[in-house]
Each structure stands twice: as C-alpha cells, then as structure tokens.
C-alpha cells in the first residue's frame, strides 16, 4: 500500500513542499483505514457515549468508567445519579488483530492480547481480565482448525505468562471467515481517580521517554497491511508485517508501569501499537494540541543500521511512550532498570510541529559509535494534521434485503434436529478453549468461563489474603460478556446487531447484573463494495440503537475493515463487549440444581419473536438448510430493552432462583442441554419446532422454587412454564406430537465435538 495520489496532493499542499520518504510513510500509515477510520468515522456519531459513569469516553487508548457504590450496583444506570458512583474506576477497551492472525495465528493473536493490555496500562490501570471473541471458517476445514488452534495457543500463552485471566468470550464457525478469521480481544483494568492517566500531552518542555523492548524491524507497515484485502499469498508475503510478542517482557512492563503510576511519574502515556513510535508519539502530542522534537538515534534498538522510517513505523511489541517531567527522568530510568527494561530519552514536547531528526547513529547493539554524524530533519509536520487530517471517504451503499421463508422440506426428525444443533461447533462446548486459559489468576474470578457471563469480584479491600476477603454478597460484582453471531447479522445486519446487543445484555442479566457500558469491535469486508458497506452501516445503526435503548453508552471501540479475501467478504460482525454491575458476586449458575428439583419449576421469562417466531439466522437452519426472516425483537414502545434486562436481572437475584441461562445460539434446545447435569435433568413441553430452535434473545430459562414471586418480578414480560426439574440427569422434550430424550452422557458426547476432534 502506498500514499494515494489525492492524499499526496493534500500533503504537498499542507507542507508547501514534497514530503520526505519518512513523512510519506507516516501519512500512509496514519491516514490508513486502520488508523484514521476513513470509511467508518462518519457513521460512528450514531453511538451515544455519555453518562454519569463515563470518566473518559471514545478517543483515548481505553475508556474509563466510575464504578457504582455496592448499594447502587443493582440499580439500572438510568436511575443512578452522579453521587451513586465512587472513586474506583475500571478501564474497558477492545481491539482486533485479524489480518496478522491469518498470516501467523500464534503471534498474531498473542500480540493482539499484548496491545489491548498496554492500552489498559496507558490509562494508569492494572489489567484484571481479558475476553476473546473469535471467528473462523467451517470447523470441518483443515485450514480453519489450524488457525483456531494457533490463535487459542497464542492467546493462552501470552495471557497466562502475563498473569491476566481470560475469563470469557465467544467462538463462532462460519464459512464466511474461511479466508479471513477475526480475533477480537477486550481488556478490563482497575484504577482510581488519583491514578488516572490519559493520552493527552500536558506541557511543552516535558520529556518524552520510550520504555520497554528494543525496536526491531518486525511489524513494519502493520497499519497499512490491516487496511487492505488479504491477498492469496498473504501468508508468505505479509509475514514481515506481523509483530513478534514477548510476554515475559510485557509482564515486566506491566509491573514497571504500575510502579511509575504509583510514584506519579507519568503525565501522559500511549502504548506503541499501530504505526509504532510515529503513531504513538504524534497522536499523544496532537491530542494536547502540541508538538514534539524527537531524536530517532536515541531510540534503543535491537537491530543494526535501522533507518528513520523503520524506527518510526516498526510495531515491535512491549513498548510504551511516556511524557515525564524533566526532573523525574532519572527515576523513570532507575525503575526501568529495576524491571530489566530498555529505556530511552527520545525527545521533548514542544509548542511547534512534530519534528524528527536522524543521523543514523542509533543505539543498536551492534552499531559503531557514530555520535559525530550530523542529524537531519526527516519529519516536520503539524501533529494534528498528521494524526487527524485524513479526509473521510464518501462511499456508496446498498441496503441488504431479508430472505424469504423457505424451510427445509422434509424437515429432519426432532431427534436429528436436536442432535445436529447441540453438536454444532458454534453451539458446542468451548471447554477445549477455556481450559487452556488460566482464568483464575488474580483471585477475582467469581463466575468462570462456560457460563453466560464472567463475574469479577471488585472487593472493598485491596488485599488478596483469603482471611481479608469480603463475603460474596459484599463489594461489586463486575459482569462481562462479549461476542456476536454472524448467522444473525448475515441474515439481517440491522436487526441482527440489535439482537447481539440484547443477547450480551441478557448474559449479564442472567447473573443478576445490569449494564454499565459497552465497547465494540466493528468488523466488515471491503467498504468500497456497496453491498458490503450497506451491511456495515446496518450493524453500526443496529448496535447504536440497541445500546441506547439498553442505557449502555458505547464508550470506545475499534473498526476493522477490508476483511476480504479471494474467498469473499466476511459477514458483517459487530462484536460487542458489555460490562455490568451487581451487588456482590454470588450469582446463580447455568446448571440445574438437583437438591431443589422436587420443589422447583422451570420457567421461560420473556417472549419469542414479536411476529410469532422466525428461524432466520438460527443454527437449526444452518444445519438443516433453508432460509427465513430474522425474528422481530420485542416491541420497545411499551417497555425498553433496559427495563426488560433489569426485570430479568431482578429475577436472577431473587432468593428462590437456583439456576439461570439465557436463550440465544441454538435456541431452547441448546439452552436446556447446557443446563442439564449428571444429577439434574428437565422434562419440558413446547408447542412447536419454532419454539425449540428460534433464537430471539432477551429470554431467560429460570429454575425457581417460587414461580409466583418470579412472575411478579418479571412484570410485563411473558412467563411460560416449561416443565419440571428432575433428578434423572436427562433432557426430555415433548414438542407437539413428537417426543425425544437425551441423558447427560449423550448430551456431553454431543457437546464435546471440539474436544473430541482436536484431542
């Protein structure tokens, strides 16, 4: 990729001269789709991003949110006021590493984790949790399995080594990702009002320092690489654009960053990600309306004879750029040495242009001493123009149409249908994935992977000593969910994206939590194709409308376009990561309770599709064939999505509730199968096949000993008695005139397809 002729003309007009080679490379990367959001930024104003809980919103390395006090944690966000929030903050961010993970799945995924963790650190926060949402081609394809295994290995190795638990996420398999997998990773950090740092440079005369690994040539041009379709030979030709991670250096950098923030040495910070040092340093000073003067020869390097462009644009990992007061430089250097990290004074903040000087006498380990070489100015541009001056694209779009109803004829038997849906790789157990993650490191994980949402314990004491830990009904439980369903958004981008938001919110509600805020990772194909851009617009608008109705401000995110290859574009994929709160962290599991079986009933809270139900976007149709319109979500005129979710959360928190599980991928067939244990089963009656397999979100299966109390809490939401909880460890289904049953061993075998195939 090179700077386009129209962009080149704009740069020449701005500079009043021809740009240098280093300037051309900087503009090429910082004005790329990956950095500048040239095709998506015009659409992003649809998102609401404000609220009393929002301390730092979109535009920084990560969002910062104030946590409610424990007694207000169950209250919906719209009903809280500013006084309900304390001085304890969480950071929340999400990133994609899609193209790199296709070329090199292990390093591509690993460095995606490293990048979002450093985004968290740059806000003065300590990372406490990761979530990964992963999308691959058909599980039956060898290439997809290779990418799947490599990506999970990369995430698990990096996350485990740095001591940050991966506590949740999602995995989907769909033929549309065969030529371009998606790796979306979210990170949550913990900080407070006194430790908050931003990526806004503060004052001319302050020192700019680089701390972390030495700069090499890996990841060169990564931003521009991520802004193009994947070519057929990308796996070999684009390998230099993939970064190489070092999790042990990242762990030392995490602890060093913590020490720097503890001593109040950091005035502003930015991690080195897309476009490397050039991107981080120019964006840092641009946000402050300032400039900088950098000495590129001062950058500590791990390879000899690097030129100015390589030093500026290499995306070598585990590096941070800090603004520091001149009198604190020696202390920063001492702390970097303590943690065995490289450290360089690379320049200063100015009130002029963004200027870089280079003589070719860098700090590479094998370089000869050439300190007498004369420096020349290789970059001299206005920082704000470089960071924010890219013109936006005005692209044509075509709105997608809903498919007609064409159900399979003859339809499979009930036995066959349930077996195929429960054993589908997208709905099957993901135990093979999360068992590779150390999800308990940090002693905060109260609800582990495999449930609807993870819950992290935010205690009122900072101690991790078991004797000091607060009871499970004290403190704030932080609920986390992330994911998207490509079947939904391929069928109907707008309604599918609304469903993605509601489904993630229902995951939180199933554990008794209400939404606090969201971040999104908007993935699409080549936006220059009108039908692709139309689908992308649909997921943006759908997600924006649903999050607004959920009272969940969208406080940050990431856009990844040009996920297109010789196989075609990916389905529009709006990964949503949602964070919620509840008082305490003792939530009902997604597993039936045998001890209360004789005294409890199984209820379904919430309606199916408002149009009587539809199977569009369902796993049932993905397995059996056929098409249908996407289900119409519940009417929000009389009861908002936020009110619906609050009612479901209240049900989950009620003392009579022993188990809860949301209905989503695979419909009730999968939800019920996942609830069954060796000791507890379910005997369920449903009116028809649509009721078994439709995937309308916003519904909760509840095991309760007090159905009347649950119905009262549900308010206007429909309540359907599904049947009884049994002690035989079997799922028995009566659907119209059909009946079928599966014992716990059979269900375990069906759901264990990924473990079995990858053993």
Swiss-Prot record:
GO terms for molecular function: ATP binding; magnesium ion binding; phosphoribosylformylglycinamidine synthase activity. Pathway: Purine metabolism; IMP biosynthesis via de novo pathway; 5-amino-1-(5-phospho-D-ribosyl)imidazole from N(2)-formyl-N(1)-(5-phospho-D-ribosyl)glycinamide: step 1/2. Residues 388-422 are annotated as: Disordered. GO terms for cellular component: cytoplasm. It comes from the Archaea. Pfam families: AIRS, AIRS_C, FGAR-AT_linker. InterPro entries: PRibForGlyAmidine_synth_PurL (IPR010074), PurL_linker (IPR041609), PurM-like_C_dom (IPR010918), PurM-like_C_sf (IPR036676), PurM-like_N (IPR016188), PurM-like_N_sf (IPR036921). It catalyses: N(2)-formyl-N(1)-(5-phospho-beta-D-ribosyl)glycinamide + L-glutamine + ATP + H2O = 2-formamido-N(1)-(5-O-phospho-beta-D-ribosyl)acetamidine + L-glutamate + ADP + phosphate + H(+). It is found in: Cytoplasm. Keywords: ATP-binding, Cytoplasm, Ligase, Magnesium, Metal-binding, Nucleotide-binding, Purine biosynthesis. Mg(2+) 1 binds at residues 95, 558. ATP binds at residues 37, 520, 557. The active site is at residues 34, 97. Gene3D superfamilies: PurM-like C-terminal domain (3.90.650.10), PurM-like, N-terminal domain (3.30.1330.10). Substrate binds at residues 96-99, 118, 243, 315-317, 560. Mg(2+) 2 binds at residues 119, 271. One of its GO terms (biological process) is 'de novo' IMP biosynthetic process. Its EC number is 6.3.5.3. Monomer. Part of the FGAM synthase complex composed of 1 PurL, 1 PurQ and 2 PurS subunits. Part of the phosphoribosylformylglycinamidine synthase complex involved in the purines biosynthetic pathway. Catalyzes the ATP-dependent conversion of formylglycinamide ribonucleotide (FGAR) and glutamine to yield formylglycinamidine ribonucleotide (FGAM) and glutamate. The FGAM synthase complex is composed of three subunits. PurQ produces an ammonia molecule by converting glutamine to glutamate. PurL transfers the ammonia molecule to FGAR to form FGAM in an ATP-dependent manner. Belongs to the FGAMS family. NCBIfam families: FGAM_synth_II, PRK01213.1. This is Phosphoribosylformylglycinamidine synthase subunit PurL. It comes from Halorubrum lacusprofundi (strain ATCC 49239 / DSM 5036 / JCM 8891 / ACAM 34). The gene is purL.
